[in-house]
Every structure is written in structure tokens, then in C-alpha cells.
């Protein structure tokens, strides 16, 4: 835990939407009188018909969650149509291509017209309200158009990250019963071209239910087009009208399905609905990022993940924001790319993942200092806890000690940000997600099921629902209940552990399955990893537990070294001693393996399941590795594995 406290600068207290006193007042109302609070905040969007009741939800029994009952609205209308009168000529999306120099600025009116055209295309393909549409596109404007078009006509989009394998795509098409697939000839990722149509063809062969495949001509690569099934996006849209009336949707009608990894390795299709989701993403985007008219906002996530859904498209566009879509990667053509984009587009708000921060930190300060970044006033992180060392580098080097950092905790299932600083209200502690957002009631539960009061550590749960909470797992409500509502009855079980300090701040300690029990002592992997990364020789670390005859479990650490350091037995001993001194003897790694890389998904998350299997020598059952960014990393880990199981 970091002892540093960064107080809110006076200018932020004055300019922000929310200072500490207002946060306390709004938060208290949101939990003590949620009907009044959410009834007021729901007016930030336009309703075709008003809702009759704010909420009717229960975490017990069959688990039934409903918000803004009987209200009628359309998400695409709220992201586009209602802005046309005042913002029609304002930029909605800045597209920054993979190659420097490739860019496009799309106004709200242009985006509206493109969405209407493609809505009509979908209708001409027989898509109706409630139908599922699979989208397998790179980070190009057509991805935003496709998802908004689905929302406009009441279809349910299922976006599959464009780095996923044909098998992963086929599984998601089959599970959601999609008869329409939208893809591109190729995607671009740094110097590589990714054959999306090729992968889509293989997936369609496996899934066997896709009737129409709409293909964006992105790179111009020569790809096979199956007569009667495959259709070119540009040819279809050219024929259609720029007007398409929005479908009136019930507040609880589905908006999208997004697949997330399950503990069993089987993906879960998390279902989000319409009214509560758009109210909550709009509210969180405004307050967490302190978004004001005219700000240039950039979330670096891929829309294939929930962060991209909520904080590249839906939240920002509902607020009439300028949002950036970036096709490329942080290190192409060099490690200054992110900061060059910040300068080029005068970005004010920058939101990225801790794994990106650590990767850029590994390259030193020069790629950052080669740019000015004077426009940037707020930084954010999302996806996993950020270790204090990376937080401090981000604050000192990228933000030049003038930019607050909003370290946000939330999940695919929560729909929007849950625990977070508000930049004008919250003193910051590096590594802490700090305090709950409006309407969020976190609690800590011990292993006996008792709710902890005051400072403590336990399972992180939520005591009541919020508007953006997922409603079910598509086609499997029993799995929804068993995953999130059985472990601690009457609460939403996040699957994460957390610590609450004496100031009421929350520190996410990692997934529950990332807790190691060494000789009866429960240790969060995040704490040990942060300790290792605090050593100058360590660029990145991942820690897992493995069976031990005496201790029950012992610690196996995988360490990636910073440039200028070489693996050695001396360094291995030094790092083990470093952790021992920092946390205590109980946290000393039993095994420490040096590695050039860690196994990560294409969204940058470490696949700890793989690391546990390697540590325990369970090499014949590694499970699904289709989401790995670089499968060769696993081979290297196995080759250099240190015999650990006792």
C-alpha cells in the first residue's frame, strides 16, 4: 500500500463538476433515496415515453433486475439524433488510423447519416428487433456505425474482438444464434495485416448459421466472396437512404451481448439492456472524466471489450462528446505514438490500461518527453489494479505532476465504472481505486460470510443493484445466478478481493482465485507483484500459487526484466530478499522464473490460468489459448519452467 496522498488541486476543486462536499451530498442521496436520485439523473437522456418506476430489483430468489420500468427510448437516438440541432457540425469521432497521417473527423450529422444508411442495410437483410448481429471488425469507423445501427433498429449486437480466433468467433456466433456477420477484408495492427475475412470464413464454416456476411473493404486485400452470402459494405450502403426512424425500445429490451471469460473456460454472453445502461454510462463518463463541452477525450481500449462499448461509444456520444478511435498499437511506428496523438489532436482526457503504462514505462522517459502533452489535463486507468510504481511514473512523467489519475474499477458485468476517484473531489492514493461512484454500495465479506465494518480485507460485493448491471447470461440465467449471486446471498459477488483502509478507500487485491494461501496466510497476488515491480530490475511480474506439501500453497513468480538487466542466480536471490523485506517472510517467492514475456490476451490481461498450469506442471491441459496475443510465449515458459511442485 502506498503511503503517498495527492490532494485535490484548488483549481480542480473549482472547475470540476463535483468537489468533495458535492460528492458526499450526491452519494448520500444516491444510496438513501435512490428513486429521487436516479429519477433526476435519468433526465439526462431523452425518453419517448416516461418510466413509471425507477427500479424493481432483487438479488435473491430468481434474481430479477429492472430499471426505469415501462420507459421507452432508443440509444442511437440519444447518441445521435438529439444532438443534430446544436452539434450537427461538431466532430463526434476522430478516427486515427494505424499509419500516422491516416485520420478522419466524422461530425454528428455525418455519423447519423452513416448509421441510418447501415440501419437500412440491416433491414434489407431481414434483420428485425431482437435479432442478434455478430460484429468482427477492427477499430475503424464502420465498427461504431454498425453497433449504433443495431441499436437504432432494435437488433442486439455481439461484438467479437478482431484478434480472436475463428474458433472463438464461431463459438460466439453459435451461442448468440447470429445469422448476420459483419467483418472486414483485413485489420491492421502495427506492421501486420490480420486476415479477418479469412478467419470469418472459417468461423462461418464451423458455425453454419450465418446467412449474410457484410464485408468492409478496408485494406483492399483480395478476399474470397461467397455468392449469395457475402456482400460488400460500400455497395450496400450506397443504395440506402440517410433516414431511418429509430425503433422505440423498452428500457429493459436488450442492447448488446458481450462475451467474457468464465472460470470454466467457457465464454459467458453477458447481456446488457437499454435504459439503465445508457443513463449510467452517460453519468459516469461526465463525472469520472470531468467531461465538459469541447474536451477531446481518448480511451485507448478496443471496442471489442466493454471499456470500448461504454467509454468510446455509448457514454461519450450520449454526452455529445468528441471521442477518439485509434486503430493502431502503442509502439508503432515507435513508443511515442500515444503521446504524438495526444499532441496532434490536443487530447484533454486520456484513459488506458495499466499494462500499457507498464510497457511504456519499460522504455524509459524519452519517448514521452519527446512530446509536449500540454493539452492533457486528466489521466485514467482501467482493466486491472495499477501498481503504485507505475501510477507514480504515469503521474510524474506523462502527467508532469499536474494531471489527476482516475484509477477505475469495474467489470464487463457492471456495465460502467463502479469504484473510482472523481478528479475534483478525491484525494488520490497510488494503487487505490478510492471510493464508490454514485449509487454503488460496496461491502467486504469474510470467508465465513460476515460483512466487515471499518478497515479490513475480504470479498468485494455490492449490496444493491445499479442501472447498468447486466441482467443475465444470454440463454443461461441459471449460470448468471450461480456465478454472481449464490456465494454471498443477497449481494452481487464481484469475484474480486479488496482491502478497505481507515479512510474508506478501496484497494483491489485481485481476483479471488488470485489469492494464495501460504501456511494459512492469505496473500493477494497484486501485492506481491507490486513489490517485485518496485525493484528497478523488474519491468513486469506475475505471481501464482502452486501446491506445497508443507505450506499448502507456495509462491511461483514470473519476472520480466527491465532493459539493461540480465537473468542471474544473484538477481533471483536479490529479488526474493527484496519481497521478503518489503512484505514479510511469508510472501517470499518459493520459485522465481525469468521470462522475456508473459502470456497475455489481446486486451493486455495476463492469463494466470496458463501460469498456474505451467507452475504446477499440468502441461497436458492448458485449456483454450485462442485469445493469447502470442502463443509462442507459452512454449518459452514451459521450456524454462523450474520444477516447483512438492
Swiss-Prot record:
Binding site for CoA: 189-192, 307, 331, 519, 580
Cofactors that this protein relies on: Mg(2+)
Pfam families: ACAS_N (PF16177), AMP-binding (PF00501), AMP-binding_C (PF13193)
PTM per Swiss-Prot/TrEMBL: Acetylated. Deacetylation by the SIR2-homolog deacetylase activates the enzyme.
Residue numbers bearing the N6-acetyllysine modification: 605
GO terms classed as biological process: acetyl-CoA biosynthetic process from acetate
GO MF, any single term: acetate-CoA ligase activity
Record CDD domains: ACS (cd05966)
Reaction catalysed by this enzyme: acetate + ATP + CoA = acetyl-CoA + AMP + diphosphate
Protein origin, superkingdom: Bacteria
UniProt-annotated binding residues for ATP: 383-385, 407-412, 496, 511, 522
Coiled coil: none
Residues the entry annotates as binding Mg(2+): 533, 535, 538
Gene3D superfamilies: 3.30.300.30, N-terminal domain of ligase-like
Assigned EC number: 6.2.1.1
Annotated GO CC locations: cytosol
Keywords linked to the UniProt accession: Acetylation, ATP-binding, Ligase, Magnesium, Metal-binding, Nucleotide-binding
Family (UniProt): Belongs to the ATP-dependent AMP-binding enzyme family.
Family annotation (NCBIfam families): Ac_CoA_lig_AcsA (TIGR02188), PRK00174.1 (NF001208)
Role according to the record: Catalyzes the conversion of acetate into acetyl-CoA (AcCoA), an essential intermediate at the junction of anabolic and catabolic pathways. AcsA undergoes a two-step reaction. In the first half reaction, AcsA combines acetate with ATP to form acetyl-adenylate (AcAMP) intermediate. In the second half reaction, it can then transfer the acetyl group from AcAMP to the sulfhydryl group of CoA, forming the product AcCoA.
The protein's name in its UniProt record: Acetyl-coenzyme A synthetase
Biological source species: Desulfatibacillum aliphaticivorans
